[in-house]
Structures are given as C-alpha cells and as structure tokens.
Amino acid sequence: MKEYRVYLERARFFQQDFLYPLIFREYIYGLAYSHKDPRSIFVENGGYDNKYSLLNVKRLITRMYQQNHLIISTNDSNKNPFFGYNKNFDFQIIAEGFAILVEIPFLPQLSSSLEEAEIIKSYKNVRSIHSIFPFLEDKFTYLNYVSDIRIPYPIHLEILVQILRYWVKDVSFFHLLRLFLYDFSNWIPTKKSISTFSKSNPRLFLFLYNFYVCEYESIFLFLRNKSSHLRLKSFSVFFERIFFYAKREHLVEVFSKDFSYTLPFFKDPNIHYVRYQGKCILASKNVPFLMNKWNHYFIHLWQCFFDVWSQPRTININQLSEHSFQLLGYFSNVRLNRSVVRSQMLQNTFLIEIVSKKLDIIVPFIPLIRSLAKAKFCNVLGHPISKPVWADSSDFDIIERFLRICRNLCHYYHGSSTKKSLYRIKYILRLSCIKTLACKHKSTVRAFLNRSGSEELLEEFFTEEEEILPWKFQILTLLCHSQSFSLHRYERKYRIWYLDILFSNDLVNDE
C-alpha cells in the first residue's frame, strides 16, 4: 500500500480519474515488475539485463491505433495481426499495465476505509476465508432454509468494462481498453474468450470480475436494507418489482388491493448472505416462499441489468436439516440432536425430549479423492499410486513434498466435525509416497519397507498436528497435569479454525 501511495504522489498533476496519461509512465510498469517473479514478462526480446521496456509498450499502443480492423478476414481469425508472432508476450505486457492502472484510483479509498474502521491490526484475521465458518456456527443453527447460488460469469468482456465506466471517467482510457480487448477477441473463440482471458491475465480479470460482483451486491444490499427498514406497505411494493426503479405507482395499487392480508409474511429480518469467489449462500428462517422471491430477483437482476443469463439449476433451495451445502471445500448442514431428560415433580415422573441444533461441518471425501486422482496421487477408486514425475528428486525432497501436502490439508480441514475421512486421505498420501520412493529405487514396496524400516519411515504422517495447534492450547497442556485432560481429546471434541488461511488449498474441490 505504501508503494502505491508514492507513485500516486508523483501523478498528482494529472486530473482525477484520468488514467490514460499514466499508460506512458515508466514507473507504472516498474511497479508491476517489482511485484512479479524475476522471469517477468516485462523484458526486452533481445536485451542484455532482462528488464522491462517502456519502449515496447509505446510501440504496441501505437500499433493498436494504426491497425485497420475492417480489412481483417475471417480466414485470418486465428492469426493475431496486432500482436504478431510474440502475441502472448505482448498481450501480457499491456494487460499488466491495465491491471496496475485500474487499481490505482481505488487504493486510497480502500486504505481510508480500513483506517476509519480501525481494523488494520486485525486485517489478516478479517481476510481469512475460515472466518466465515464461526459466523455460520453462530447464525445458521437458528435458520431453516438455505439457497445455494452460483454467480454467473459475464458472457462478454465488454460487460465488465461497462461496469467499470460508472466509477472511472476517462474516455481515452476505456477506448484503448476496448481496442485491446477487441484485438484479443479476434484470435480467441468467442465461447472461450472469457475463460482464456481469466487464465492468461488473472490480475486484470479478477479486478474486473470483482467490480461486477460488487455492483450486483450493492443492489442486493440495497434490497436487503429496504426490506428491513421500510414499512410493510412499501416493503411489499418493493418486492413485487422486477425492474427495481420503475413501475412503482402501478404496483402500489395492485398490492394494496389484492395482497393486503399477506404483507406480514414478506418481512424477514433473519436473512443472511455469505459469498466467496463465484458462489454465494442465502439463508433464512421463514418458509421457502421468500427464498423463491429472492431467487427470482437475482435472475432478473443478472439478465436485465448485467445481460448475463443464469440457468435455473444454478440456484438450489434446500432445508438445512435435510440437505447439505458445499462451501470452501466443506460439506455443511444443520444436525438435530435429540436428548431425553427425566423430570420428577412430587410423585409424578416426566420424560422431556429436547431437540437442539448443531452445525455439522465435514470433510468431503469423494471430491478429495477426485482431486487426488487428478493430481496423480491415486486412481479414481482411491487406490494410491506412485508419482513418477517426482522420482528424479532426492528422498528428502520427495518426503518433504508429501508431508507439506499432508500438513496443509490437515491445517485446512482442522475445523471438521469428524476427521475419519482426513485420516484416510493421510493414509493415501503415505502409501503414494512409499510407492514413489520404491519406484525411484527400482524396488517393490515390501522390499523397500523391509530395507528402510516400516516403523520409522514416514512416521510424521500419523503424528498429531500439535505443532500446528495454537500456542495457547500447548501452554494449557503443560499447565494441566491432570490425566483427565488431553490435547488429543480436546482436538477431537472441538473444532479449531485457523485465521491465517487466506486462500483455498489446491486440492480443495469447491465445484
């Protein structure tokens, strides 16, 4: 954040929200270069010292303006007339420049909002993706229905650019950005353009996509606030609108005449919304009628305001006590715990049944097996196989790689209610490691274990993750000398969420 502020001070003489002049500033690309790997894309093709070149950027922009798009034939659609022979190199140069530029105007707003909220010290904990689950444990036990929604992707990059236009007023900059995306779409098929663009230029795509999500969420929050604070009559009118800012007077008359007795059912203060990446969850306590209303408005909002088609099957409404929903690699549902309490009053005895709710969060075993099979650690049935690609490494490096994967998975899934599936995953990784070592030494698994010692080899796979546990629990173990307390029992009974996890594990399948 401080590095960006320095460069913002140097660009003060430019008019606010005018980004086009910054394209030709060398420090913009130097900033992008400093945050990347030394094998950066900002290099001269025939240079001596592998540094980025502002001259290349200027040449590419000049070529973009000089290109005549009317003479491009359909037979040459696979060839890129602008980018030439080194199209990937040139394309990423411009894309990184655009990514840096569109981020600059919003960084001061982000820093000021964080300072006003006074959450700088705990910002890392707020950023943790596992901070969602304590919220679910506190709120979802009182709810009954959940709507699992997958946010649709924009069908064209132009939609993302149009959303950004509401925030940044610079005609020249957006003209160049559209010209750049137009040249990009000429040599990429239309159906694959958005996916190819997101893979080759994740920084620029994520920025544009986050603005798309932010825009739709701002409208959703407006709906949510109105549903809580408006009177019932206004609230009912608001819910019957398809186009949110039109046709209000007519709907007032319709609702006042036909639906005056059903107005109280529309109010739902216990509605909760959670989103991560391209998936969101909407939970409510009332009957699923209100959830259906919200889903209809989501679909109309995406289709009418963003021109994005959403398939109906991407939105599912389920009862929490009967169905589970998938979020961040976990399967979660609300489990009903029934217990019988005996009560005695004078000479009469009563049996009272108490039903309590508990959020059950478990490790999805089958999706993990699919991820391990895709990574070539086992087959589709879960049988461990060797990893011949790693056979060229030393024994220590092979063991360290498997241990790192195992520890990361245990660290990520430590908040699970039951850890039996996690122990089976550790067993698969252990046997895959042994088979990889046996393949390297050109021996069988049995002969390799007899030679190395099966008891001492890879014992870290079955040790408890006490080094991962917080230091508070370790101190508690040292202070408590009673045999009734055990860290292992505490670990099995309670869930522990780590707030240092900022990204999903590579093997986590959250489809």
UniProtKB/Swiss-Prot annotation:
Its main location: plastid. Keywords: Chloroplast, mRNA processing, Plastid, RNA-binding, tRNA processing. One of its GO terms (molecular function) is RNA binding. It is found in: Plastid, Chloroplast. It comes from the Eukaryota. One of its GO terms (cellular component) is chloroplast. GO terms for biological process: mRNA processing; RNA splicing; tRNA processing. Pfam families: Intron_maturas2, MatK_N. Belongs to the intron maturase 2 family. MatK subfamily. Usually encoded in the trnK tRNA gene intron. Probably assists in splicing its own and other chloroplast group II introns. HAMAP family: MatK. This is Maturase K. It comes from Trifolium burchellianum. The gene is matK.
